Amino acid sequence: MERYESLFAQLKERKEGAFVPFVTLGDPGIEQSLKIIDTLIEAGADALELGTPFSDPLADGPTIQNATLRAFAAGVTPAQCFEVLALIRQKHPTIPIGLLMYANLVFNKGIDEFYAECEKVGVDSVLVADVPVEESAPFRQAALRHNVAPIFICPPNADDDLLRQIASYGRGYTYLLSRAGVTGAENRAALPLNHLVAKLKEYNAAPPLQGFGISAPDQVKAAIDAGAAGAISGSAIVKIIEQHINEPEKMLAALKAFVQPMKAATRS
């Protein structure tokens, strides 16, 4: 949890926003997945947002669903995902690592056991995509017991009550949704979210990172100009993996070429 605090403090000092890539653990296989994550960090990623393969990913569009299918095809299991997380943490001691999960994966392990395992391997935050704020108590309580930041999604139509709850319960960062719907780079991020950012600040929420539909440097800049602390990009990155699925070296080069200008756009 503290890794987010020190990251945001460092970025503020350098007058930069955060660029956070999302990938699915184990896509397209464990070994290449680790190389992908190393490449993202070398290219300038400030934090990681990682998914674990799940059979029914409701919030995800086709690009990330395909990533899950590739990971399943490679035989990736939840237990292996935790092994991979431990390896990432060992190699990269300071980078914040966030998980994007679905509730069933947490229930399968047992809520407390799941967060205990997260703490053990060095995960900093968990966002459970299909658990609304009002049903989040058992998750966020277990998270805090194990020093893991509970992350909440702030939708573009959030009312004042929801904004207050997100500010009060969330830690680490706030996932600011560019638009409603499922993930995907095809639908570009919509209107600037200045009013939401202002309210979240007023209620002392964790720093907002804007996600969904972020696929170009100008959108990263726009998110930061609107007051967000940074931007999360998933589908655009996962698409690069898909496009170069049979050319591992080309894939890593293309990922690097994508991340560098995205990170550069965070510098004012």
From Swiss-Prot:
GO cellular component, one term: cytosol
GO molecular function: tryptophan synthase activity
Pathway: Amino-acid biosynthesis; L-tryptophan biosynthesis; L-tryptophan from chorismate: step 5/5
UniProt-listed Pfam families: Trp_syntA
Enzyme class, spelled out: lyase
Entry-linked CDD domains: Tryptophan_synthase_alpha
Gene3D superfamilies, per the entry: Aldolase class I (3.20.20.70)
Keywords linked to the UniProt accession: Amino-acid biosynthesis, Aromatic amino acid biosynthesis, Lyase, Tryptophan biosynthesis
Catalytic reaction equation(s): (1S,2R)-1-C-(indol-3-yl)glycerol 3-phosphate + L-serine = D-glyceraldehyde 3-phosphate + L-tryptophan + H2O
Residues at the catalytic site: 49 (proton acceptor), 60 (proton acceptor)
Coiled coil, from the record: none
E.C. number: 4.2.1.20
PANTHER family the UniProt entry points to: TRYPTOPHAN SYNTHASE ALPHA CHAIN, CHLOROPLASTIC, TRYPTOPHAN SYNTHASE, ALPHA CHAIN
HAMAP family in UniProt: Trp_synth_alpha
Protein purpose: The alpha subunit is responsible for the aldol cleavage of indoleglycerol phosphate to indole and glyceraldehyde 3-phosphate.
Assigned protein family: Belongs to the TrpA family.
Oligomeric form and interacting partners: Tetramer of two alpha and two beta chains.
The protein's name in its UniProt record: Tryptophan synthase alpha chain
Organism: Escherichia coli O6:K15:H31 (strain 536 / UPEC)
